[in-house]
Amino acid sequence: AENMTHGMVQYVDMPNAKRLNLSYANGDNFVMRVDTSMKQPNGRPSVRLHSKKTYEDSVIVLQVAHVPTGCAVWPAFWTVTENRPLWPKGGEIDMLENANDQYPYNLAAVHVNTSCAVTNPEQTGTTVFDQCNAYANDSSGCRIAMNGTDAGATWGHKLNEKGGGTVAMQRDFSEG
């Protein structure tokens, strides 16, 4: 699979993911993981999922029971335009992301290829960057720190200790 993050990882196909036990069902949970059994000079084998179907107006919900934490991990759940080679044209929305445990909370973001800004947001988090242009702020886009009502429990060890959480997004292309 394509490595859009340019990280030290080898994304494997479905047969290899099954063979290496990197993705599987466990009761009501779907597990995705990285191979921790061997060191690889080009990065550890892991999985990356993408939808075969595209969505426009929609509600997307992710219930997560556990996120990996620590140095050299970059767990994320995001949406991107179906024209990925033209990124950031069409945009990207990061619903759940935090690389290398840099922050104690989840970081949501929007990346677009035009001038766009977050103004007067109705949110419980804190606006870290208000410019959504994908090339501004070291490619951070508009970034919101999810540190509002349940500070610290939106990411990492605190999220895992409370048994996980839910991230949801309504995508609506109508004006307003």
Residue spans for each PLM region:
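Mixed-charge, polar/low-complexity N-terminal
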Residues: 41-42, 152-153, 169
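Eukaryotic intrinsically disordered and solvent-exposed regulatory patches
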Residues: 46-48, 153-155, 164
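Short, glycine/acidic-rich beta->alpha junctions
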Residues: 54, 69, 85, 150-151, ...
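Localized edge beta-strand/strand-to-loop motifs within extracellular or lumenal beta-rich domains
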Residues: 161-176
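Low-complexity, Ser/Thr/Pro/Gly-rich disordered linker/stalk regions
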Residues: 1-101, 105-109, 118
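Glycine-aromatic-enriched beta-strand/loop faces of beta-sandwich-type recognition domains
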Residues: 88-160
